[in-house]
């Protein structure tokens, strides 16, 4: 379905690639993968990268609580013993390029991250620069035993040597396409769509 004019006057086509049931299934699969890779749920902490990564971390925490009894405290969401957020704004490499971003709050889970397996949670993995900023931000907070990355969508086009450990959907895209995730908590619905012709 057409979505009108892009900023450069190019017609943009929009294609839906994931809807609510697909996103739910992807998060359930990621939760099982995380538990399998960690041999259970002990010493695991989720840190969502705001904005939508934080929402996904909360959802993932609830899914883990459904599967793993020791994750029941994660039902409390951000700030619980197992789920937090990690603001990467001041660690981004595009700060001096006129791209304005409002800082978010970093919320470390009550149990901290030292000696834990930290799973960074983000919505869309693209260039890898946000994840690099997250790794930098993590250094100032503590010393986890290991850091893993879970993303809902990996769209390719990496500019840095970064790879996700857990991916909900690999979505090959062209460089002039934009992948957008809407979540009910922030946008009113659960959808992943591709806008074509957006640079």
What role is predicted for each listed range?
Residues 1-199:
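PRPP-associated nucleotide enzymes
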């Amino acid at each position: 379905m057409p979505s009108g004019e892009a900023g450069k006057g190019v017609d943009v086509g929009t294609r839906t690639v994931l809807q609510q049931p697909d996103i739910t299934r992807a998060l359930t699969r990621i939760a099982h993968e995380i538990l399998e890779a960690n041999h259970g749920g002990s010493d695991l902490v989720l840190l969502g990268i705001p904005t939508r990564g934080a929402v996904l971390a909360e959802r993932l925490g609830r899914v883990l609580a459904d599967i793993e009894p020791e994750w029941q405290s994660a039902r409390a969401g951000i700030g619980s013993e197992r789920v937090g957020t990690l603001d990467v704004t001041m660690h981004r490499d595009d700060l001096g390029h006129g791209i304005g971003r409002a800082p978010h709050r970093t919320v470390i889970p009550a149990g901290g991250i030292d000696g834990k397996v930290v799973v960074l949670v983000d919505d869309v993995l693209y260039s890898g620069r946000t994840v690099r900023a997250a790794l930098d931000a993590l250094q100032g907070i503590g010393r986890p035993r290991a850091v893993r990355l879970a993303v809902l969508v990996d769209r390719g086009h990496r500019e840095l040597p970064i790879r996700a450990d857990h991916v909900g959907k690999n979505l090959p895209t062209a460089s002039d396409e934009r992948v957008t995730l809407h979540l009910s908590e922030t946008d009113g619905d659960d959808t992943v769509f591709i806008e074509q012709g957006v640079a």
